[in-house]
UniProtKB/Swiss-Prot annotation:
Keyword 4Fe-4S: yes
Annotated source species: Paramecium tetraurelia
Protein name from the UniProt record: Anamorsin homolog 1
Cell compartments where the protein resides: Cytoplasm; Mitochondrion intermembrane space
Family note: Belongs to the anamorsin family.
Subunit structure: Monomer.
Keywords linked to the UniProt accession: 2Fe-2S, 4Fe-4S, Cytoplasm, Iron, Iron-sulfur, Metal-binding, Mitochondrion
Region span, Fe-S binding site B: 193-207
GO molecular function, one term: 4 iron, 4 sulfur cluster binding
Amino acid sequence: MNLKITINQQASISDSLIIANLNLIQFFRDNTFNKIECDQLLTLKDAVQISQILKDQGVLIYEGEINESVITYFQASGLYNQGQGKFIKQVLQIKKLNIPQQEFNNCYGKYDYIEQKFQNQINFFKQVDINGKQEIIDENELLDDGVQVKQVESCASKPRACANCTCGRKEMEEKQDKEQLLEQLKNNSIKGCGSCYLGDAFRCANCPYRGLPAFKDGEQVKVLQDDVFLQEQEEKDQVKLENGKVKLKI
């Protein structure tokens, strides 16, 4: 089977081909395509190349039996199947539809112009009339007497200060707690839990001995204002014990 390109029977191959595509024209010789032994050897890429070198209204004649795959390739490359192995390269033209005016008027719907949407919109940037023609709104009337701003709750009625206290009560209570702790240590007071000597892990939250090392049950812990019990070390401070007593410096 052979492929043949022509516009008509009298035209030569140069009238049907675009001479600029010299690299593709070399496939053609004496108005015939190189012989194809099998239809499967013709690929879509080959069909596209053939369509590219055809001029407008150029005709491709397929000699021999043709199967559906070959027709599909030529149609996919832009050629129109005229039957009997003839394919033509059509010219795509865009024309305006000539619709009578009467049929055009019968069309339903109305074109919505963009300009129409902005004609009835409110102009928020309109200049304010200051000549007294427009009423000026009193800003005091904008607030209603019935609407009241919620006041921040006070912690005066609570036993302890709030967690996010900003009035200074939290700092004052912390200072009082420290003073009370020192006073309890000076008076050798012992809490009722009875676990003060075991260490911080067994002491209650308000234990006056929190922060001090564990001591033996029955030992007296006194606060001496004149003695130094902490000695500065390289890594940490250590508590000095003398005669079973813990010395604190204030």
